[in-house]
């Protein structure tokens, strides 16, 4: 049972989702895989065989000085790169069971550390950043709060858009990086039920 902030009501939560043992290795693997999936992997450099330039020997072999060949060698300015980077995929395989287990572990650890705050509802009547700031001040959520609602709220999303450290997600848009990086996760009671349906 978790207490709903701002009232005496309690919400029953699943131990499998909010009381799971924390596995740092699992969470690290899933977070790294998630971040790597967002990498373009388009970095490219040219080797000595790919750069434009003549392959003619730059100077005579004899006569003193170093014994250079083509000016496309990596030692020269404008030459190729010794171990040239090539486009590649950084994708790591993480199956669904691992991903969900990591999300459960993160929620459980947030709960144990007192960084998980459940509220009855979290919405704004109009798109006003000032109203959102006042609401967050009343909750004491730290510098980097993550607000999780059952469904996307346009007023809430637009109000938080120009607050650089405030994130707003619906349950469907949750990801491990957002959860790990938040000082406090503010989640509505309806969103808790939806999270349990997803992860249990």
From Swiss-Prot:
Residues 43-67 are annotated as: Disordered. The keyword Ribonucleoprotein applies. It comes from the Bacteria. Coiled coil: none annotated. GO terms for cellular component: ribonucleoprotein complex; ribosome. GO terms for biological process: translation. InterPro entries: Ribosomal_uL4, Ribosomal_uL4-like, Ribosomal_uL4_dom_sf. SUPFAM superfamilies: Ribosomal protein L4. Keywords: Ribonucleoprotein, Ribosomal protein, RNA-binding, rRNA-binding. GO terms for molecular function: rRNA binding; structural constituent of ribosome. Gene3D superfamilies: 3.40.1370.10. Disulfide bonds: none annotated. It holds the Pfam family Ribosomal_L4. One of the primary rRNA binding proteins, this protein initially binds near the 5'-end of the 23S rRNA. It is important during the early stages of 50S assembly. It makes multiple contacts with different domains of the 23S rRNA in the assembled 50S subunit and ribosome. Forms part of the polypeptide exit tunnel. Belongs to the universal ribosomal protein uL4 family. NCBIfam families: rplD_bact (TIGR03953). Part of the 50S ribosomal subunit. HAMAP family: Ribosomal_uL4_B (MF_01328_B). This is Large ribosomal subunit protein uL4. It comes from Xanthomonas oryzae pv. oryzae (strain KACC10331 / KXO85).
């Amino acid at each position: 049972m978790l207490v709903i902030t701002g009232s005496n009501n309690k919400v029953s939560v699943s131990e499998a989702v909010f009381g799971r043992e924390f596995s740092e290795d699992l969470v690290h693997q899933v977070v790294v895989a998630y971040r790597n999936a967002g990498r373009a992997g388009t970095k490219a450099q040219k080797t000595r065989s790919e750069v434009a330039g003549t392959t003619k020997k730059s100077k005579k072999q004899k006569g003193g000085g170093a014994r250079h060949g083509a000016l496309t060698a990596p030692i020269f300015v404008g030459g190729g790169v010794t171990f040239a980077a090539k486009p590649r995929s950084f994708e790591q395989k993480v199956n669904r069971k691992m991903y969900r287990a990591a999300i459960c572990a993160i929620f459980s650890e947030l709960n144990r550390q007192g960084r998980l705050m459940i509220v009855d509802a979290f919405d704004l009547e109009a798109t006003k950043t000032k109203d959102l700031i006042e609401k967050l001040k009343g909750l004491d959520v730290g510098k980097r709060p993550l607000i999780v609602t059952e469904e996307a709220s346009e007023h809430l999303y637009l109000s938080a858009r120009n607050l650089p450290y405030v994130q707003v997600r619906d349950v469907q848009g949750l990801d491990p990086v957002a959860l790990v990086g938040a000082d406090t996760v503010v989640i509505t009671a309806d969103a808790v039920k939806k999270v349990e349906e997803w992860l249990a």
